[in-house]
């Protein structure tokens, strides 16, 4: 049984949460997010908190309630504080620059890669080898970061590639003769 669903999500000042049938909308200073709630979960908004209750008789209702609680908590944090993900480019000649709403990546291929950023994600390049992605939707930020990392994942011998800022790359020893 999930214990995550038992903890309510507190609504901070400046954040408005509304429920219209099965659609939950969270509005805050940084933007607004909308999510359709699973039928196995009842959502109750009262006294500045959002509570999640499983529907009786539905298999895995507690699991769905816990998942819904985590997603709604991410929505509340996103519209109030926002999320950011940092990427680091490691390798000779690997660089990134911002061109309008796109990121121009040079990752050792014979051609430059241009990654178009979706709506709701902003990027910043403090240096040629660093990328900072910001936005209100945690899932979207993680998806964009994973797509950029997927162009050239870190390899285990020299550690070259695109990695998350907090990622530790396991290194292998080269073959000995």
Swiss-Prot record:
Family membership: Belongs to the universal ribosomal protein uL6 family.
Compositional bias of kind Basic and acidic residues: 152-171
Record InterPro entries: Ribosomal_uL6-like (IPR000702), Ribosomal_uL6-like_a/b-dom_sf (IPR036789), Ribosomal_uL6_a/b-dom (IPR020040), Ribosomal_uL6_bac-type (IPR019906), Ribosomal_uL6_CS (IPR002358)
One GO MF term attached to the UniProt entry: rRNA binding
Top-level taxon: Bacteria
HAMAP family: Ribosomal_uL6_B (MF_01365_B)
BP-aspect Gene Ontology terms: cytoplasmic translation
Keyword Ribosomal protein recorded: yes
Subunit details: Part of the 50S ribosomal subunit.
PROSITE patterns the UniProt entry points to: RIBOSOMAL_L6_1
Function noted in UniProt: This protein binds to the 23S rRNA, and is important in its secondary structure. It is located near the subunit interface in the base of the L7/L12 stalk, and near the tRNA binding site of the peptidyltransferase center.
Protein's name in the database: Large ribosomal subunit protein uL6
Annotated region described as Disordered, given as residue ranges: 152-177
Keywords from the UniProt entry: Ribonucleoprotein, Ribosomal protein, RNA-binding, rRNA-binding
Pfam families the UniProt entry points to: Ribosomal_L6
Gene Ontology annotations for the cellular component aspect, listed alphabetically: cytosolic large ribosomal subunit
